[in-house]
From Swiss-Prot:
Single strand-specific metallo-endoribonuclease involved in late-stage 70S ribosome quality control and in maturation of the 3' terminus of the 16S rRNA. PANTHER family: ENDORIBONUCLEASE YBEY, CHLOROPLASTIC. This is Endoribonuclease YbeY. One of its GO terms (biological process) is rRNA processing. It holds the Pfam family YbeY. One of its GO terms (cellular component) is cytoplasm. The gene is ybeY. It is found in: Cytoplasm. HAMAP family: Endoribonucl_YbeY (MF_00009). Its cofactor is Zn(2+). It is an enzyme of class 3 (hydrolase). It comes from the Bacteria. The lineage of its organism: Bacteria, Bacillati, Mycoplasmatota, Mollicutes, Acholeplasmatales. It comes from Onion yellows phytoplasma (strain OY-M).
């Protein structure tokens, strides 16, 4: 899978790029995904506008629906926005690495682009198992502090 990583924050994301590329490279997906690191203010703006929830969240996914809505061929799976600040706080709270939190959020966003949801317990468990599998491929686990 092809990913493009964009940084719209003042934080240095260079240490996380190789992990993210390594994590998504083996996934058999021919479309491009954009991972965009943003500020809490930006993600709150997006969350408010698109979901009518006026607070910052950790990750938002926006699938590319051009093919569906307009019948157009496009090579983009969609965009995943990650709040770097939110990831830092969540990693500290959960007592695991920022690397693991960013990887988790990126995978979570990717699965939403692929159509997975977690509205029910069954959907949640399916999504959790897929996240765990992808994270384990790069030596990260959901239940460990790494």
């Amino acid at each position: 899978m092809i990913i493009k990583i964009h940084n719209q924050t003042s934080f240095c994301i260079t240490p996380f790029k190789s992990l993210l590329i390594k994590m998504f490279l083996p996934i058999k997906e021919k479309k491009l995904m954009h991972l965009i690191f943003v500020t809490n203010e930006k993600i709150q703006e997006l969350n408010s506008f698109y979901r009518q929830k006026n607070y910052p969240t950790d990750v938002l996914s926006f699938p590319n629906d051009l093919t569906f809505f307009a019948g157009l061929e496009d090579n983009s799976l969609g965009d995943v926005f990650i709040s770097f600040s939110k990831a830092q706080v969540q990693a500290q709270t959960a007592k695991h690495s920022l690397e693991r939190e960013i990887a988790f959020l990126a995978v979570h966003g990717f699965l939403h682009l692929k159509g997975y949801q977690h509205r029910t317990e069954e959907e949640f468990q399916i999504m959790l198992a897929l996240q765990e599998k992808i994270l384990q491929n790069v030596g990260l686990n959901l239940d460990k502090t790494t």
